[in-house]
Amino acid sequence: MKYTSYFLALLLCVLLGFSGSYGQGQFFREIENLKEYFNASNPDVAKGGPLFSEILKNWKDESDKKIIQSQIVSFYFKLFENLKDNQIIQRSMDIIKQNMFQKFLNGSSEKLEDFKKLIQIPVDDLQTQRKAINELIKVMNDLSPKSNLRKRKRSQNLFRGRRASM
């Protein structure tokens, strides 16, 4: 993998921002360990521009930003999974993953397991593709705003109630 990917992956962790002075200090030390290990401070890392920070600038709305952040966090989990056998940087990756888990998934183990399941789904498997297409309508319905539907049902119920009482 290119060093640029590693450096920018670490940059996202910084962008997510972590609270707590002790935890934050340790977090930054672990990032520095990874930067040193991957030689991420080398000037050639900047070649081609950043991976994520420019994309994040384009998304202002908080709920929209969460969508992009989920894709970026997914990248980091895949990156860390790819490097899981590297004992030299394992501790640093574990601390960073824990911080991401707390910040992005609010410390929910169930959400983490679901998130891991999603990023492990192979997109080049025919059976997976068939299942995904089969579920597409339900997924699209879940993506649709529900507030308008609720308002419409509520106003219909109010209208029916008035008609019955007249």
From Swiss-Prot:
MF term (GO), any: type II interferon receptor binding
SUPFAM superfamilies: 4-helical cytokines (SSF47266)
Keywords: Antiviral defense, Cytokine, Glycoprotein, Growth regulation, Pyrrolidone carboxylic acid, Secreted, Signal
Source taxon at top rank: Eukaryota
Modified residues (Pyrrolidone carboxylic acid): 24
Signal peptide coordinates: 1-23
Tissues in which the UniProt entry reports expression: Released primarily from activated T lymphocytes.
Glycosylation sites: 39, 106
GO biological processes: adaptive immune response; defense response to virus; humoral immune response; positive regulation of autophagy; positive regulation of biosynthetic process
GO cellular component, one term: extracellular space
Cellular localisation: Secreted
Pfam families (UniProt xref): IFN-gamma
Function recorded in the entry: Type II interferon produced by immune cells such as T-cells and NK cells that plays crucial roles in antimicrobial, antiviral, and antitumor responses by activating effector immune cells and enhancing antigen presentation. Primarily signals through the JAK-STAT pathway after interaction with its receptor IFNGR1 to affect gene regulation. Upon IFNG binding, IFNGR1 intracellular domain opens out to allow association of downstream signaling components JAK2, JAK1 and STAT1, leading to STAT1 activation, nuclear translocation and transcription of IFNG-regulated genes.
Protein family per UniProt: Belongs to the type II (or gamma) interferon family.
Database matches in PANTHER family: INTERFERON GAMMA (PTHR11419:SF0)
Complexes and interactors: Homodimer. Interacts with IFNGR1 (via extracellular domain); this interaction promotes IFNGR1 dimerization.
Protein name: Interferon gamma
Source organism of the structure: Bubalus carabanensis (Swamp type water buffalo)
Gene designation: IFNG
